[in-house]
Structures are given as structure tokens and as C-alpha cells.
Amino acid sequence: MKREHNHRESSAGEGGSSSMTTVIKEEAAGVDELLVVLGYKVRSSDMADVAHKLEQLEMVLGDGISNLSDETVHYNPSDLSGWVESMLSDLDPTRIQEKPDSEYDLRAIPGSAVYPRDEHVTRRSKRTRIESELSSTRSVVVLDSQETGVRLVHALLACAEAVQQNNLKLADALVKHVGLLASSQAGAMRKVATYFAEGLARRIYRIYPRDDVALSSFSDTLQIHFYESCPYLKFAHFTANQAILEVFATAEKVHVIDLGLNHGLQWPALIQALALRPNGPPDFRLTGIGYSLTDIQEVGWKLGQLASTIGVNFEFKSIALNNLSDLKPEMLDIRPGLESVAVNSVFELHRLLAHPGSIDKFLSTIKSIRPDIMTVVEQEANHNGTVFLDRFTESLHYYSSLFDSLEGPPSQDRVMSELFLGRQILNLVACEGEDRVERHETLNQWRNRFGLGGFKPVSIGSNAYKQASMLLALYAGADGYNVEENEGCLLLGWQTRPLIATSAWRINRVE
């Protein structure tokens, strides 16, 4: 702790006289003479208030002073009341100083203890609120992370509501308050709040995040880290592959159309499974769709090397598109009657919802090629409503669960995974119109869309459910994950909240 004392040292010749004069002057001014001798200026009338603040400070420092910043500067400690107040403010960032020019009293944001408390906070929270014997309205020190956490959530929601009402002045004040409250939190809550606060700030100040083709390779790289750090993508690939393998069980030629190839992480496992088929491996054709033709071709070459090594005949076709709605049937080179066709989409279809009519056009294209199965993995969330505050609230709960599931020992994969999810949050909160591409919908909403598009559901099956559950049991932190079967679809969730859903579809031939 750094303290800067603004005392001026008097010369030796006048030191004694000066000290006595000071005591007399201070006593005449009603300042307590005993504290003056110790170098502190405290009026007798302020003694009760100072005693109250000192009691608060003693409580705060009860567990040590390790939480004080090394860069803290306390000015003029001879002003005991002001010095203690500054100490309390530094220790507790939730204490908001009232400014004469401030139009909004942000201290009114409510809160109550609902978040899990750690052992350190439990010890301190017993002495969190101290009531003065002289007044029941004295300020209190709120250091309990539970209380601050609830205040943080209320501040985020209040800011989102101000944005919805286009009250940008209030929103500006609230988003700054959110940053202050978030700084006192730790773990997943702090990270989630920081991303949502940044999204709100970008929306308020109109500094929108980019989501263009130039950044697609970076997003693909982040997705690799997300794949490594948690089971969500592994679950998506495994369950989709199981559904595809059931359809390909006896086919001699098979064709997979991947709507978002990225780094091709899904297909080595499928190629190996086809190689082990009792009746021998089929000829395997893969059509990979993505943004960069060069990147797609490189992934195809690597998969071809793997297939050759394990004895699977492999053919690859690359297609570069900026939007899946631009896909045409003739691009896919379908060979009717000669091959079994599967279409695969992992976290791709929701992006089509940013462009009116695109999803209907796309489903019409897929229907025209008559695949034997279409596997779809999407976020289990409703982030595509018309009311901003509703979307914000739903996404805050959704990503809080996701970030909570990522908590663990620090690693590069975890940090990059958080950035991967953070970019989604920024797009969801800050952007509108065609720029807002993170438009997640629930499984029931996708059921309605596919039903109207001429598709019917295919049950993924209990075998995939059992194997997915076994896969999760081997994963670190598996106790928090759960697999749920819902009308032939499989959902993976954290604690009690479903987070992603895998479904399978085929053409409804009776329409």
C-alpha cells in the first residue's frame, strides 16, 4: 500500500511553537485534542461517525490486507474521517460516490444473496452489515460477492432496458456501473458480465463488432480450442455421426455434404468407423462448404491422406460460399440411385435467419436433392425474438451456464474458448439487422421450420444416447453435464439447463 503524506515539515527552530499553536487552533475549532496530538484532525461532533467507519474498516481488514492494491494512494491521512472513507471505497468497489451532477442514483439497484458463496466470503459476510447505534440510516459496507453478484445482474438488465427504451444517457451511466461491479467478481460471472457490458457499450456508442469473411479463419481457430476444452462440439460430432452411420450401414457409396467444414474435425472418426464396417468400407465422397476455397481444399487433402492410410476410397469436392442460401443443387453433383446422401450442419443454420427468406430457400434446395438424412446441431436457446430485453435476458442466462461449465484450471484452450463465446455475445448484444447472425432458436422452433419445409424427424436412437452418456463420463467435470433424450433428439446440458440439441431429418415423402 502506498500512502502519500501531504505534510509540510517545518524548520527545527519553529517546530515546538508551531505544534502547540496548531493544537490550540484545532482545539478552538472544536477538534479533539487527543487525536490532534496523534496527528489526526477530528471534530468532537464527528467522533461517532469516525468510530463507525473505523469499525467498518476493522471488519474489512479482518482477513488481512492482501486485497488492497499496491498502487493505492491515500491522500492526507491526518484527515482521519476522509482517509478511512477512502480506504473503505478502495476495498469495496461497490460503494458508489454520489456526484452532484449525476442525474441517476445507481445505488438503488436492488440485490439479494442467491449466488454460491466461497469459504473466504462466508467468513466475511457474517460481519457484512454494521448498524450504527446512533442512526439506522448509516451507509454499510457491502463486500459479500452474493449481494454484489445480484446487483451486477440487476445493473445489466437495467442497462439493457435503458438501451431498449433508447435512454442512452441512463444506459451510459449504467454500463459504467456494471464495469465497476464486475471488477469485484471472480470466475465465470465476471467474464460473462464483462462481455455483455462490452456488447452494451458497443451498442450505446455504435462501435459494432465485425463479422466478415476476413475473420472467418480466426473464428475457425477459436473453434478448435472450444472443441478441445469442453464436450459440446465432441457431443455434436459424435451424435451426428451415429445417425449418419445408421443410414450408411449397407450402402456401397456414400456422400456427406458438410455445410460448415471448418477444420474437418468431425470426419476422421466417421472415416475410421466406415473402415471398420463388417461388410467393408464404402466409397466415401465428402463435399465441404466454407468461406475460403484454399482452406477447404487443405482440409480435404488431409482427410484424403487419412482415408488412404486406412483403406477407404475417398473423393473430395470443395465449395466456397459467403451464405448457405446461395447454395444451388447443381453445385453438389448428386448421383441419384448411386449413393446414399447425408447433409450435416453443426451450428450453421441459425446464421441464415439474419436474412429474411434465406432459411426457406435453403431448405427448398436441400429438399430438392432428396438426402437420406440431414443431421442438425444447434444451440438450445431462444435468441431470435423481436424484443431486445427478452433476447438479452435469455442470452445472459444461457452464456452464464456455458461459461460456468468452462471453469477449471487456466489453459490456452479455455481462454480461447471464452473468446470464441465472447464474440457470439458481442454479436448478439451489439448488432441488429443482417449483421446480427447469432440468432439461435430452440429445438421446438426448428421442428416447426423443418416441418413446414417438408421434412420429418428421424429418431437418433437410444444407442447413441447411451454412448454419448458414456463419452461424457470420461470427461473432466462430467458430473455437471447431462444428456437428455427428447422425442428422438439428443440434448447436452450443464446442470439443469440444456445447451445444445442434435436432431435428424429426412424428406417427408407423403405431403
From Swiss-Prot:
Basic and acidic residues: compositionally biased ranges: 1-11
Motif (LXXLL motif): 349-353
Chain intervals for the UniProt region annotation (Disordered): 1-20
Tissues where the protein occurs: Predominantly expressed in germinating seeds and flowers and siliques. Highly expressed in inflorescences and weakly or not expressed in rosette leaves, etiolated seedlings, siliques, mature stems and roots. RGA and GAI transcripts were detected at slightly varying levels in all tissues examined. RGL2 signal was undetected, and RGL3 signal was very weak in all tissues examined (rosette leaves, seedlings, inflorescences, and siliques) except inflorescences. In the flower, it is expressed in developing ovules as well as in developing anthers throughout microspore development.
Chain residue ranges for the region called PFYRE: 341-427
Short motif DELLA motif, span: 32-36
Chain spans, region VHIID: 223-288
Disruption phenotype: Rga, gai, rgl1, rgl2 and rgl3 pentuple mutant displays constitutive GA responses even in the absence of GA treatment.
Stretches assigned to the GRAS domain: 143-506
Keywords: Developmental protein, Differentiation, Flowering, Gibberellin signaling pathway, Nucleus, Phosphoprotein, Repressor, Transcription, Transcription regulation, Ubl conjugation
SS bond list: none
Gene Ontology MF annotations: DNA-binding transcription factor activity
Span of the annotated motif LEXLE motif: 54-58
Region (SAW): 430-506
Annotated motif VHYNP motif, positions: 73-77
Annotated GO CC locations: nucleus
Induction: Not up-regulated upon GA treatment.
InterPro entries: DELLA_N_sf, TF_DELLA_N, TF_GRAS
Pfam families cross-referenced by the UniProt entry: DELLA (PF12041), GRAS (PF03514)
Renumbered residue ranges of the record's region Leucine repeat II (LRII): 298-330
Subunit organization: Interacts directly with the GID2/SLY1 component of the SCF(GID2) complex. Interacts (via N-terminus) with GID1A, GID1B and GID1B (via N-terminus). Interacts with the BOI proteins BOI, BRG1, BRG2 and BRG3. Binds to and coactivates GAF1/IDD2 and ENY/IDD1.
Protein name: DELLA protein RGL1
Organism per entry: Arabidopsis thaliana
Gene that encodes the chain: RGL1
